[in-house]
């Protein structure tokens, strides 16, 4: 059975693992997932991730979640643009998350990046998710 929203699946796995206070979570690998995880790691929301080759052309990503004094670094993570309803924004209309305390992750012609980077480079794109 094919998965209709691979990125949404990864975000749900992260959300569920954080609710159960897990240290790591495993998800199937893809380039988009890896780029989103790069942004999450650079912003300090996860400790890191590594890609594990399973052979036969398949691989998984093992994500190390981050906690501080028993609380998850990610309070809320949600998908914005979905397969049935894509959400595109211009550089001037990129929303602020929690008055600037959180970030939006966008897929732009210049790559996957956080909202403030897209504003700085004056580029819009598909609004993938919000993290707070």
Curated annotation (Swiss-Prot):
| Annotated Pfam families | Ribosomal_S8 (PF00410)
InterPro entries named in the record: Ribosomal_uS8, Ribosomal_uS8_CS, Ribosomal_uS8_sf
Query: What molecular function does GO assign, one term?
Result: structural constituent of ribosome
What does the UniProt keyword field contain?
A: Ribonucleoprotein, Ribosomal protein, RNA-binding, rRNA-binding
Q: Name one GO cellular component term.
A: ribonucleoprotein complex
Q: Which GO terms describe its biological process?
A: translation
Q: Where are the transmembrane segments?
A: none
Write out the similarity annotation.
Belongs to the universal ribosomal protein uS8 family.
Record's function text: One of the primary rRNA binding proteins, it binds directly to 16S rRNA central domain where it helps coordinate assembly of the platform of the 30S subunit.
PANTHER family the record matches: 40S RIBOSOMAL PROTEIN S15A (PTHR11758)
Q: How does it assemble?
A: Part of the 30S ribosomal subunit. Contacts proteins S5 and S12.
Q: What is the designated name of this protein?
A: Small ribosomal subunit protein uS8
Q: Which organism is it from?
A: Bartonella henselae (strain ATCC 49882 / DSM 28221 / CCUG 30454 / Houston 1) (Rochalimaea henselae)
Q: Which gene encodes it?
A: rpsH
């Amino acid at each position: 059975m094919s998965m209709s929203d691979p990125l949404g699946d990864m975000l749900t796995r992260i959300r569920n693992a954080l609710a159960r206070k897990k240290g790591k979570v495993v998800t199937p690998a893809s380039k988009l997932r890896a780029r989103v995880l790069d942004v999450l790691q650079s912003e300090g929301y996860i400790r890191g991730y590594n890609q594990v080759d399973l052979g036969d052309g398949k691989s998984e990503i093992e994500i190390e979640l981050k906690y501080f004094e028993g609380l998850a670094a990610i309070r809320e993570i949600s998908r914005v643009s979905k397969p049935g309803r894509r959400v595109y924004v211009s550089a001037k209309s990129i929303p602020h998350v929690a008055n600037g305390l959180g970030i939006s992750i966008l897929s732009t012609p210049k790559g996957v990046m956080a909202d403030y980077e897209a504003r700085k480079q004056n580029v819009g794109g598909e609004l993938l998710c919000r993290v707070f």
